[in-house]
A protein has these predicted regions:
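N-terminal basic/disordered segments at the start of proteins
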Residues: 4-28
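Hydrophobic faces of well-ordered beta-strands that scaffold small-molecule active sites
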Residues: 8-11, 29-31, 64-68, 95-97, ...
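Conserved, mostly hydrophobic/aromatic
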Residues: 21, 99, 132, 164, ...
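Glycine-rich, proline-tolerant flexible connector loops at the mouths of alpha/beta enzymes
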Residues: 30-48, 68-74, 254-261
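Active-site-adjacent beta->alpha loops and helix N-cap segments on the catalytic face
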Residues: 41-51, 100-106, 145-157, 258-260
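Active-site beta->alpha loop and helix N-cap motifs at the rims of alpha/beta catalytic domains
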Residues: 47-109, 114-122
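Catalytic alpha/beta core domains of metabolic enzymes, predominantly
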Residues: 114-247, 261-264
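Conserved small/polar residues in nucleotide/adenosyl-binding loops
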Residues: 277-282
Length: 287
């Protein structure tokens, strides 16, 4: 039986971030090209940069996963395969997918390429995961709202690899189901153009106690951030995730700087290695 060693998966929005992730110890890097990605405002990779990145990663025995994780319109599908083909031929290790039509098209046209179900698919239970497995998916990025026990059960019941977010920003809504940006800014978060209205301050208006509609004065409270979640950090729970044999530990941040990518990746690399190769690391994990 192969010895367990969870994959550390780091983000890259630029070539400098890719190099930083590799240097800091990432086993794999996920990144987006100029099309079909859920981070339209990241640097993203041109065709030439992506091919260069694949060559660099494979030189260091690291993997590259390409994000094709947005909802796709009918007139965009025709150019999908031509866009993916050079990366597939260069040994692209996997594609992270949201759209079901994209999934089917990739499965038929690129045999042997790993297909990963994006967190944007909102996979929360085993029947959904098994359906995706029947369509060729080999790895699930489960909804970030799931508990560790739910993820563990999902893995046991499906036999699929689990890629779990361990660090970074969280959406206030279920992954892949948010329409807030579309409502307020006319920019679809499910098409890679989220305006992040949940990160903005809001003025909370109310009534003084006992005032009701008739008697009380309108009360204006200082601006607050009621919808902006704190960032995720699982370092204190890393031993439990590794005990659950999570397959891939994913850091959020394709719009972050190379310094951020390098720093966070190095920290998780250190503690993952300590847990794998020593017995006293768990006591030293505090964020």
């Amino acid at each position: 039986m192969e010895e367990y060693r969870g994959e550390l998966l780091a983000p890259a929005g630029t070539m400098d971030c890719l190099k930083a992730a590799i240097a800091a110890g990432a086993d794999a890097v996920y990144l987006g090209g100029q099309r079909f990605g859920a981070r339209a405002f990241a640097g993203n990779f041109s065709r030439e940069e992506l091919l260069e990145g694949l060559s660099l990663a494979h030189l260091w025995n690291r993997k590259i996963y390409l994000t094709v994780n947005t909802l796709t319109k009918q007139d965009e599908l025709s150019g999908l395969c031509d866009w993916i083909a050079p990366f597939y031929e260069a040994g692209l290790d996997g594609v992270i997918v949201q759209d079901m039509g994209v999934l089917e098209k990739l499965r038929k046209n690129f045999p042997g390429m790993e297909l990963h179900a994006s967190t944007q698919m909102t996979v929360t239970e085993s029947r959904s995961a098994l359906f995706l497995k029947s369509l060729g998916v080999c790895r699930i990025v489960p909804a970030r709202e799931l508990s560790l026990e739910e993820i563990r059960l999902l893995k046991e019941q499906t036999g699929l690899a689990m890629e779990v977010f361990i660090h970074g920003a969280l959406c206030y809504c279920y992954s892949g189901q948010c329409l807030f940006s579309s409502f307020l800014g006319g920019r679809s978060g499910n098409r890679g153009r989220c305006a992040q209205p949940c990160r903005q301050p809001y003025m909370v208006l109310g009534q003084e106690a006992g005032g009701g509609r008739r008697g009380g004065k309108s009360q204006q409270k200082p601006p607050a951030y009621p919808l902006s979640l704190k960032d995720l950090c699982v370092l204190p729970f890393l031993p439990e995730l590794m005990d659950a044999k999570i397959d891939s530990f994913k850091i959020e941040g394709r719009m972050k700087s190379p310094e951020y990518v390098a720093g966070v990746t190095a920290i998780y690399r250190k503690y993952m290695d300590c847990l794998l190769y020593t017995s006293d690391a768990a006591d030293d994990m505090q964020c």
